[in-house]
């Protein structure tokens, strides 16, 4: 005879870990070449002058300078650029 009541089998109880996406360096900040500026899924922000786009859509500085966020173009896209100092 069982001395414990039968336990239920829940189908919950798991979650994926956070991916730490978002803006890592903000407008006006000085960054070194190679610094990650934005981690994103898709192109919420587009690469402007002196900014590269990684295969996972990460934006990174290709030159040392100050970050400039701007909205431009007919589709009002958000661009991230580096103004070289």
Swiss-Prot record:
* Coiled-coil regions listed in the entry: none
Positions of the region Disordered?
A: 1-21
Q: Name one GO biological process term.
A: translation
Which keywords does UniProt give here? Answer: Ribonucleoprotein, Ribosomal protein
State the InterPro entries in the record: Ribosomal_bL27, Ribosomal_bL27_CS
* Keyword Ribonucleoprotein attached: yes
Which GO molecular-function terms appear in the entry? Answer: structural constituent of ribosome
Q: Which family does it belong to?
A: Belongs to the bacterial ribosomal protein bL27 family.
- Protein's name in the database: Large ribosomal subunit protein bL27
Gene name of the record:
rpmA
């Amino acid at each position: 005879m069982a001395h414990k009541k039968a336990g239920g089998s829940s189908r919950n109880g798991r979650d994926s870990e956070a991916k730490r996406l978002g803006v890592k360096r903000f407008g006006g900040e000085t960054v070194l070449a190679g610094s990650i500026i934005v981690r994103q899924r898709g192109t919420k922000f587009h690469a402007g002058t002196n900014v590269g786009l990684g295969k996972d859509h990460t934006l990174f500085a290709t030159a040392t300078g100050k970050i400039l966020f701007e909205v431009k173009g007919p589709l009002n896209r958000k661009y991230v650029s580096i103004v070289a100092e």
